[in-house]
Amino acid sequence: MARTTLLLLSILFLLPTNAAIKKLQVEYLTNPIGLDTTVPRFSWQLESAERGVRQTAYQITVATDAACLNPVWTSGKVASDESLHICYAGPALTPSTRYYWKVTVWNNKTGEETSTEKAFFETGLLSDGWSGAQWIKATQINKNSKINPEDKKQTKARMLLEMDVTLTSGNASVLFGARDASNVFMWSVNTLDNEKEPLIRRHIYDRGRLQSSDTPIGKFFTKSDLLNKEHHLAIEAKDGVVKTYIDKVLVDTYTDTDSKLSNGYIGFRAFRGNNTNETAMFDNIVLTEYEQKGDKEEAKVVLKEDFEKPQSAFEGGEIVSVGGNRKLNMVSGSGDYRVLQVDMSGVPMFRKEFKAKKKIASARIYSSALGVYDLFINGQRVGNKMEDGSIRYDELKPEWTDFSKTAHYQTYDITDLLRKGENAVGAQVSSGWWNSDVCHGEYGSHEVGFIAKILLKYTDGTSETVVTDLSWLSSMDGAIRMGDIYHGETYDARKESAWTKPGYNTANWNKTAVNPYFKGELIAFAGPTVQVRPHLSRIPLSTTVYQGEKDGKINVVSITDKPAPIRLKKGETSVYNLGQNMVGWVRFKVKGASGTEMKLRFGEMLNDTGDKSRGDDGPAGSIYTANLRSAKATLKYILKGSKEGESFHPSMTFFGFQYCEITASEDIEVLSLIGEVVGSATEEGASFVTSSRSINQLYSNVMWGQRGNYLSIPTDCPQRDERLGWTGDTQVFCRAASYNANVSAFFEKWMRDMRDGQRSDGAYPDVAPHSWVGYGQAAWADAGVIVPWTIYLMYDNKKILQDNYASMEKYMEFLSRQKGDGYNYNGAGTNYGDWLSYEDTERRYVSVCYYAYTAQLMAKISEALKTDDCDAYASKAKAYRKLAQEIKKEFQTRYVDADGDLEQK
């Protein structure tokens, strides 16, 4: 006991007695760059080994020199114990400028201390703008061509497209003349939309605008003639006339009077939704293009595909065997699903070479995308250099916003990546949350886009900018063939190249064009970014290899109980158990022959019995994926054949899983595999341990649920075809989330999504960012009031109340108009009510209760914002208290009987 006491006393003597100022932050971030706020907020923490030390005053100094000798602003000594959300109150900040700051703190015991941490923040573009930077998109027009990508009347189509088609349900849709996603012709053999006879439905997408028209073909074929039988389809385009033949019968003639159709790429479409289910099979595809040479017409077959080889000319779809013939089977799980030629279906890449004429003092890149993007300078991925020299990468940027109103841009310090002389910048952009199924068409189906501005500051005090314009080049022939939030990623390592380095051969690269589709506001991202969180990575607990099934169970070949290389033969399946339901992806290293295709699928659990009547979708021990619904959640990796092995992780998607299944077209050796957790890097500030294993597991489940579902936005689930920002789920869990981690800035961003999605009548959306379903539903729309109040309550964050007050008032006005059934206070809509309750609760009862609650909160919010008892906020607080009482009074009349019991109608 004496030894223990002496040891404790020794430790105490070693601790500093003076207070220390730690964790200096601006806008909840340590040394952030690229802030667009004109009034940044400062915070710090006071640490001391002595009990009872507290701050009594502070003084903040902001300067453009690291020593803070020439202040831009000083707060002066302020008598206050506040150390959070202290607002800058100096002269207007200059765009693209680094400001250093320090704070001096007086405390009640040890006197005065000044911070020693190197603390700074850097402004973004503010009102300085983008210096002429344009949103650009990829084209299929070679850089040396004289064709203007913006001119859609160039090069009239002269081609013949033939194929065998088996229409199995609904419609069979063929794309042709495709220059990009927004400029394409699509002809559908349609058996759904006319009760009497089938149609040829013509869809023409011109710069994203759709024109459609129909030709009935009942005099040639009935619906029963067309369904479930193979037919030969031919589409011929010459001299501005498009003729369509079925089994050599001319069924439709269309005149392209505006010359919109040109020779281009082809593809196929399947659609499911709105009582429509299109499924069809395609085979023996031949595309012939014609060129006039003098008096003769020369025919050239540019595509021939019968799907008999392991890899086809098309990216996606399912290859099935019918009567010994392999066919492309087009099926959509949900929404619009398109399969395009490999040459045009890769993820768009953009590049630019530029020359730094002088020695560089500093360099920044400001960039964003319509889609999910990654960024490279001189062959290096762009990220944030940390104090220890490591690089932290932001993933899935620019993250999800309501793209009809807002997009984020990122800022990176690229000084160390550049050099005097020749440099290259590259970006690749996938569909992300811009035009994929997760958006449900909310922002259109336009091509992805990219914008960037590089600011070079030279040592002689001069500066120069490089911006996105039509001098940039594009290609769709890179290694990332497909990237989609729901469906996964396809990566062909054989297509890797040095495209992000200077001097790269761009002979086969194409022009860019202006991407005109974003009409919103481009603002700097501020908050916790989506990152890989290394401390949460998972190694496999076990790996099971099996081949086929036996008696309803997987036929096990081997089980490995520790991480080890796994030799996987063609026809075998391996299942990795990561031991924890997580959100992110896997990073693996593999050896195998060039061209071998690995297919990785992800699931949260295994089939336990193999009994389909119990809901299993495979033999016992295989991964269960039925809960993914239409989300394919699949990673495909095509090996380049490196003898040393090749490492990979995806970058354009994420998965919710505990189990990873791997199959391969040829024998491979998986040298290693780990699960990497990906999510918004909110700083976790709590831990909780009890003597109860069950309670500890419950807490663990809560933490892992938050880590997984807080990815850019607060989602409802991370794995299936949903992953949406459901507002009801969010307001219920927001308080708990605030105890677990610092989510203040996370929710400041999300509340902007709510405001962007708010309808003109004041109703908040069911999901934010708005991409689906409705508006103005009780307990869901009320999140627009509940979440700001919760964040204020937990963090003393008045800014979130100030930013959203006008929006919240607009919502309260919406509620005030919901009168009916003889009542004045009905609250919001009743689509959901007491969602998933075991016992039914009257939905109007729920909405009235929430109306009273939001009125009470609005009174408290107004009180929090008032500066004196006579200002506008004080008056509004009084009005909302009165409203809450009136709702309560009507509620009692409506739901409380004479005995004082609650009674639902």
Regions found by a protein language model. Name each.
Residues G371-V372, R381, I451, V467-M476, ...:
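Active-site acid/base region of carbohydrate-active enzymes
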Residues V773-Q777:
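Short, motif-level signal for alpha-helix interfacial/capping segments enriched in acidic residues
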Residues G317-V320:
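Small-residue (G/S/T/A) turn/hinge positions that recur once per unit in extracellular repeat modules
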Residues A2-L8:
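Sec-dependent signal peptide recognition
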Residues A20-R98, K102-D151, R158, V165, ...:
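Extracellular/oxidizing-compartment recognition motifs
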Residues S10-N18:
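Hydrophobic h-region of N-terminal signal peptides that target proteins for export
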